[in-house]
Amino acid sequence: MSLTEIQKKELRGRGHALKPVVSIGNSGLSKAVLRELELSLEHHDLMKIKIGGAERDERKKIIEQICTTFNTELVQAIGHIALVYHKLDD
């Protein structure tokens, strides 16, 4: 799945008003966080994830792991907040 720049722009606009659905703390991607991400992605096609307590490179690795594990597309990452898109099954 690959989003065009036009699609990303539209998704960024939709995501602007969203609050983070999942917060990842100092422990990183624990089993509980992965389970919460999985449950959240069943109900949200677009969601913000807050990644706290990590350096820039570590945050990037966490985002890549989330995108790979859950087949999501990174729309935008600013600071500690990542906006990801996941196409919901009909």
Residue ranges and their predicted role:
Residues M1-D90:
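Positively charged, polar, low-complexity stretches
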